[in-house]
C-alpha cells in the first residue's frame, strides 16, 4: 500500500462576469481566479485491498461516490485503465463549505494531481484539467492553480502573471448561498449590465502584469455583483 499526500487549495474570484446562459443549462463566465493558501489536506491510500472508502472530518460532506474527490479518482483510473486494488481517501477540511471558494473542486483536483504523480504522470496538466471539466466547472482551474482568466463554464483556463505575495481578508458569514441559487437569482433579475472589471478593463490587467496588489484592488471598485441581491 502507498499513501499519497496533496494540498487542495482554495480559490478566489478576483473578477466575475456572467455573460449569459448556455444550451447545456450552465452559464458562460469570464473570471480572473486566484489560488490562495487556505487548503484542505488530502491523503490517498492506494492498494488497500479493500472496497473504496472516503472519510472527511466535516459533517455534511458526502463520503460516497457523490463526493467530487471520489468521482475524480474513479474518472482518472478509468481514463488510464488502472486497477488500484482498493483506495481510501481522507479529507481534512479547512476551506469553508458554501463559501464559493471551490472546496469540493479543489479536493477533486488534488486527487487528480496526486494519482497522476503516483502513476508516473501519464497525463499532462492540461489533460488533467480537461478531465476535471467533466467533474465540475471549477476543477480545471483548481488543477492548474495560480492566477488565470477562466472562461466558458470554467473549462477554458488561460494563465496570467502571478499576483504578488499579499494578504486577502476573507469574511465568511454563518449562512451560505448555493451556486445554483445564486445563478437562479441572477437569471430572475435579468441583469444586463456587465462590470468594468472584465477582460476589457486595462487597469486591472496592467496591475496584474506589474504585480501590484494595491493597484489590482483599486481597479476592482465598485463591486457590481451586490445589485443581484438588492
How should these model regions be labeled?
Residues 1-99, 117-126, 163, 172-175:
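ATP-binding N-lobe of GHMP and related small-molecule kinases
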Residues 49-62, 111, 208-217:
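Short, basic/glycine-rich phosphate-binding loops at helix/coil junctions
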Residues 68-72, 131, 215, 219:
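Amphipathic alpha-helical interaction/coupling elements
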Residues 82-154:
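Gly/Ser-rich oxyanion-binding loop with an adjacent helix/lid
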Residues 144, 149-230:
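Conserved, helical-rich catalytic subdomain that frames metal- and/or nucleotide-binding sites
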Amino acid at each position: 500500500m502507498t499513501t499519497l499526500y496533496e494540498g487542495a487549495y482554495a480559490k478566489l474570484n478576483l473578477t466575475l462576469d456572467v455573460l449569459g446562459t448556455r444550451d447545456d443549462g450552465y452559464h458562460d463566465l469570464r473570471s480572473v481566479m486566484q489560488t490562495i493558501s487556505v487548503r484542505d489536506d488530502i491523503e490517498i491510500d492506494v492498494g488497500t485491498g479493500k472496497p473504496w472508502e472516503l472519510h472527511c472530518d466535516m459533517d455534511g460532506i458526502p463520503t460516497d461516490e457523490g463526493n467530487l474527490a471520489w468521482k475524480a479518482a474513479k474518472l482518472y483510473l478509468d481514463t488510464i485503465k488502472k486497477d488500484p486494488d482498493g483506495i481510501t481517501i481522507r479529507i481534512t477540511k479547512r476551506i469553508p463549505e458554501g463559501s464559493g471558494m471551490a472546496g469540493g473542486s479543489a479536493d477533486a483536483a488534488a486527487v487528480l494531481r496526486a494519482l497522476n504523480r503516483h502513476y508516473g504522470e501519464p497525463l499532462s496538466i492540461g489533460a488533467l484539467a480537461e478531465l476535471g471539466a467533466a467533474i465540475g466547472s471549477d476543477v480545471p482551474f483548481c488543477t492548474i492553480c495560480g492566477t488565470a482568466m477562466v472562461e466558458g463554464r470554467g473549462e477554458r483556463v488561460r494563465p496570467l502573471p502571478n499576483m504578488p505575495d499579499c494578504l486577502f481578508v476573507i469574511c465568511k458569514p454563518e449562512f451560505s448561498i448555493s451556486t445554483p441559487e445564486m445563478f437562479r437569482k441572477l437569471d430572475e433579475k435579468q441583469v444586463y449590465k456587465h462590470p468594468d472589471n472584465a477582460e476589457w478593463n486595462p487597469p486591472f490587467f496592467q496591475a496584474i502584469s506589474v504585480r501590484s496588489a494595491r493597484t489590482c484592488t483599486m481597479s476592482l471598485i465598485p463591486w457590481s455583483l451586490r445589485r443581484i441581491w438588492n
